[in-house]
Amino acid sequence: MAQDPSFDIVSKLERPELQNAVSQAMTEIQTRFDFKGSNSEIKITDDQLVLTSENEIKLKQVIDVLTTKMAKRGIGLKAFDFDSKVESATGQTVRMKVKIQNGLDKEQTKQITTLIKDQKLKVQATIQGDSVRVVGKKKDDLQEVMAAIRNANFNFDANFTNFKG
């Protein structure tokens, strides 16, 4: 007996893509004329990016370079909290810790399920921890749900994984 088609909605970042974007941004920062002699760098930790530069203006330029490289690599910028405060670091440098969103919280999963229910399609959305599983009889209904989620203006990044059909 065949199982109904389904997929999961998650908010997970592809680490290799992020590392590639950061290394490309660092390469550009090291070769750009306006960054010569500056101590600008980007580090990746488990749940955040640490951006360091000599002043706030250069830090904003580092953010611009990084976001450009991430957009080119297909990384959703909504997965990052670039609104965090700039703090003084060692010496004459400033630092910004950018939080990386990993997984959906309860409020975000509720937003997704209510959006799916408002579509009035023959699909079921169930919350499974930090993801939402969508099951339906027809693949066309699932594709409509995916299109609705892509078009929705959420303040977080939603990805689709675990396709079964």
Swiss-Prot record:
A GO CC term attached to the entry: cytosol
Keyword Nucleotide-binding: yes
MF-aspect GO terms: nucleotide binding
UniProtKB keywords: Nucleotide-binding
Source superkingdom: Bacteria
InterPro entries associated with the record: DUF520, UPF0234-like_C, UPF0234_N, YajQ-like_sf
Key word DNA repair present: no
NCBIfam families: PRK05412.1 (NF003819)
Family: Belongs to the YajQ family.
Function according to Swiss-Prot or TrEMBL: Nucleotide-binding protein.
Protein name: Nucleotide-binding protein LEPBI_I1392
Organism: Leptospira biflexa serovar Patoc (strain Patoc 1 / ATCC 23582 / Paris)
